[in-house]
Amino acid sequence: MRCWSPCSLLVVIAIYCLSSHTSEAFDLAQACVESQRLSLLPICDTIFAVQQEGAQQSADDGLRSKRFIRFGRALSGDAFLRFGKNVPDLPFEDKRFLRFGRAAPQLDDLLKQALQRVESLQKSDDTSVRRKRSTDAAPQSNTDSAEQKNDSAKITKRYVDDVEDSDVKRFMRFGKRFMRFGRNPSDVGSKLTEKRFMRFGRDPEKRFMRFGKSDDKKFMRFGRNPGDAEDELEEDKRFMRFGRGDEEDEEEAEKRFMRFGRDPEKKFMRFGKNGEEKRFMRFGRNPEEPEADKRFMRFGRGGEEDDVNTEEKRFMRFGRSAEKCKGCLEG
């Protein structure tokens, strides 16, 4: 059997003494906690004081351990980056940090308490806490505020002069139901410039969108004229027309538009200057001429030299022809 060295013997003796003392102290502390008679002894008071000091020291160590960078979920709910020193005397945690996520409920409680204190002080002292200077007028008494409310309740309509009304035509107004752009008609001395606008209302002349400087051919108009039933231009107001309209050549000008209405001649979209009306799309039946076959779209020029068969091949037709229906019935 190998002999023990003096150093090893000293280590074993020290460990035995420490373990025996710690076991005795633990047994004594447990006995002080469990037994009410032993808790009255002075040694038990000393043990309780040591335990409280140890708990306070562990709490201080926990506060000091907050000077770190933590990532992920923490058991204490502190997902933050903190820098600086912690003061253990403060009842709340140090605020020199960057925190991400939800704050601890203790901090919310402290903020609520601070706000309640400020409100209570303000109500008791009748003073307002200002954080910056204000340029508002001094507060008035209750009687002045009541008179001001009564005065504000009375609203009168502003008088508009005719000159001012003519000057404000270059804007978008809601109330007179139009949007107008361009020059003032008083500057030019003509009403032609009034046609560069979009107007909406009950007046039949104002239900259109018009663009251009001169005649009525460059606009889109919708609606009927109920007050003037004998007007020749009543049917001409349900269309969209594009291009220039010359007074000398009204027939060609009428073919550059899309017209909608009950008149069978005006249920079509026509493009071009061809007088033979071959470049258009027409829809609807003609009650006076049932064999006119106007339900088609035609493209190309149709001259007088071409045969009828060649003219009929340059379009797309929808519907039944009267001659073909007769042939089908006879067959």
UniProtKB/Swiss-Prot annotation:
<feature type="propeptide">
    <location>
        <begin position="86"/>
        <end position="94"/>
    </location>
</feature>
<feature type="propeptide">
    <location>
        <begin position="103"/>
        <end position="168"/>
    </location>
</feature>
<keyword id="KW-0732">Signal</keyword>
<feature type="propeptide">
    <location>
        <begin position="286"/>
        <end position="293"/>
    </location>
</feature>
<feature type="region of interest" description="Disordered">
    <location>
        <begin position="122"/>
        <end position="153"/>
    </location>
</feature>
<feature type="propeptide">
    <location>
        <begin position="203"/>
        <end position="205"/>
    </location>
</feature>
<feature type="propeptide">
    <location>
        <begin position="274"/>
        <end position="277"/>
    </location>
</feature>
<feature type="modified residue" description="Phenylalanine amide">
    <location>
        <position position="260"/>
    </location>
</feature>
<feature type="propeptide">
    <location>
        <begin position="26"/>
        <end position="65"/>
    </location>
</feature>
<keyword id="KW-0027">Amidation</keyword>
<protein>
    <recommendedName>
        <fullName>FMRFamide-related neuropeptides</fullName>
    </recommendedName>
</protein>
<feature type="propeptide">
    <location>
        <begin position="245"/>
        <end position="254"/>
    </location>
</feature>
<feature type="modified residue" description="Phenylalanine amide">
    <location>
        <position position="174"/>
    </location>
</feature>
<feature type="modified residue" description="Phenylalanine amide">
    <location>
        <position position="211"/>
    </location>
</feature>
<feature type="modified residue" description="Phenylalanine amide">
    <location>
        <position position="299"/>
    </location>
</feature>
<comment type="function">
    <text>Excitatory neurotransmitters that directly modulate chromatophore function by activating chromatophore expansion at the chromatophore neuromuscular junction.</text>
</comment>
<feature type="propeptide">
    <location>
        <begin position="214"/>
        <end position="216"/>
    </location>
</feature>
<dbReference type="InterPro" id="IPR002544">
    <property type="entry name" value="FMRFamid-related_peptide-like"/>
</dbReference>
<feature type="signal peptide">
    <location>
        <begin position="1"/>
        <end position="25"/>
    </location>
</feature>
<feature type="modified residue" description="Phenylalanine amide">
    <location>
        <position position="200"/>
    </location>
</feature>
<feature type="modified residue" description="Phenylalanine amide">
    <location>
        <position position="83"/>
    </location>
</feature>
<feature type="modified residue" description="Phenylalanine amide">
    <location>
        <position position="181"/>
    </location>
</feature>
<feature type="propeptide">
    <location>
        <begin position="263"/>
        <end position="265"/>
    </location>
</feature>
<feature type="modified residue" description="Phenylalanine amide">
    <location>
        <position position="271"/>
    </location>
</feature>
<feature type="modified residue" description="Phenylalanine amide">
    <location>
        <position position="100"/>
    </location>
</feature>
<feature type="propeptide">
    <location>
        <begin position="225"/>
        <end position="236"/>
    </location>
</feature>
<keyword id="KW-0677">Repeat</keyword>
<feature type="modified residue" description="Phenylalanine amide">
    <location>
        <position position="242"/>
    </location>
</feature>
<keyword id="KW-0964">Secreted</keyword>
<dbReference type="Pfam" id="PF01581">
    <property type="entry name" value="FARP"/>
</dbReference>
<feature type="propeptide">
    <location>
        <begin position="321"/>
        <end position="331"/>
    </location>
</feature>
<dbReference type="GO" id="GO:0007218">
    <property type="term" value="P:neuropeptide signaling pathway"/>
</dbReference>
<feature type="propeptide">
    <location>
        <begin position="184"/>
        <end position="194"/>
    </location>
</feature>
<feature type="propeptide">
    <location>
        <begin position="302"/>
        <end position="312"/>
    </location>
</feature>
<feature type="modified residue" description="Phenylalanine amide">
    <location>
        <position position="71"/>
    </location>
</feature>
<keyword id="KW-0527">Neuropeptide</keyword>
<comment type="similarity">
    <text>Belongs to the FARP (FMRFamide related peptide) family.</text>
</comment>
<feature type="modified residue" description="Phenylalanine amide">
    <location>
        <position position="283"/>
    </location>
</feature>
<feature type="modified residue" description="Phenylalanine amide">
    <location>
        <position position="318"/>
    </location>
</feature>
<keyword id="KW-0165">Cleavage on pair of basic residues</keyword>
<dbReference type="GO" id="GO:0005576">
    <property type="term" value="C:extracellular region"/>
</dbReference>
<feature type="modified residue" description="Phenylalanine amide">
    <location>
        <position position="222"/>
    </location>
</feature>
